[in-house]
């Protein structure tokens, strides 16, 4: 996947790495051999060669913990590629294709537990967000978005136990409150993963009755290309179905 990076993305990812290193306690995070802002980074003739150098060696990949692998993926230098397309699902699938860390992560049997635990920890981490500088707040909400988007992937949702499903939706209620309380920091884009989660849930429930075929198609299209959806529809789904089922 060909890419052109602007200075903003360059600064953002460098800062993202610095921020994550100060907030993560996982010991076996893979340290990428090249980083933006270094001579080595600029010496690569093509982006493809640079991405090849960023792959995790097989000897490391089989030993790294799922927690460490998740944090490594969240530090992948080209993680912002998820925003370089108007279809976030396609962008995420492209990240899976280009980085072996993501591919390995989604093979792990304990991925769901690790994602849920990380998601739970974010409810605590966010309490200090107002103490961060604007750029750091942006980094935090970006990682927040990516983590929530991972939780909406079919590989996760289709393998949830009943207890994990309850936990996920309970946490989603907590995170919706957080975003409302910090609406000056979280943009509307941060609502997308939870919206997608709710839509996927009702689309897979044969008992849910749609108002009309047009609404069903709109929701189906949103799953295929998650970007924008009428918030009134989401509110209706949440109030009449999600809340009744999980609260």
For the regions a language model picked out, list residue spans one by one.
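Non-catalytic all-alpha helical scaffold/repeat segments
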Residues: 21, 28-247
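C-terminal segment of classical bacterial N-terminal signal peptides
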Residues: 14-19
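Sec-dependent N-terminal signal peptides
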Residues: 4-13
């Amino acid at each position: 996947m060909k890419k052109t990076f602007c200075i903003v993305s360059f600064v953002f990812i460098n800062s993202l790495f610095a921020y994550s290193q100060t907030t993560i306690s996982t010991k076996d995070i893979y340290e990428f051999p090249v980083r933006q802002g270094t001579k080595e980074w600029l010496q690569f003739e093509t982006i493809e060669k640079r991405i090849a150098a960023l792959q995790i060696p097989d000897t490391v990949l089989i030993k790294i913990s799922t927690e460490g692998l998740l944090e490594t993926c969240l530090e992948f230098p080209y993680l912002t590629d998820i925003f370089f397309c108007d279809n976030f699902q396609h962008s995420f699938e492209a990240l899976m294709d280009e980085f072996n860390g993501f591919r390995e992560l989604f093979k792990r049997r304990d991925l769901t537990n690790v994602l849920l635990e990380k998601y739970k920890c974010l409810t605590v981490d966010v309490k200090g967000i107002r103490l961060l500088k604007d750029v750091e707040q942006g980094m935090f909400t970006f990682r927040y978005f990516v983590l929530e988007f991972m939780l909406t992937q079919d590989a996760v949702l289709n393998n949830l136990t009943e207890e994990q499903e309850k936990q996920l939706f309970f946490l989603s209620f907590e995170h919706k409150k957080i975003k409302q309380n910090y609406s000056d920091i979280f943009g509307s884009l941060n609502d997308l993963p939870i919206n997608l989660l709710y839509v996927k849930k009702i689309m897979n429930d044969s008992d849910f009755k749609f108002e009309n075929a047009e609404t069903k198609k709109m929701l189906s299209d949103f799953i295929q290309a998650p970007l924008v959806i009428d918030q009134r529809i989401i509110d209706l789904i949440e109030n009449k179905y999600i809340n009744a089922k999980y609260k």
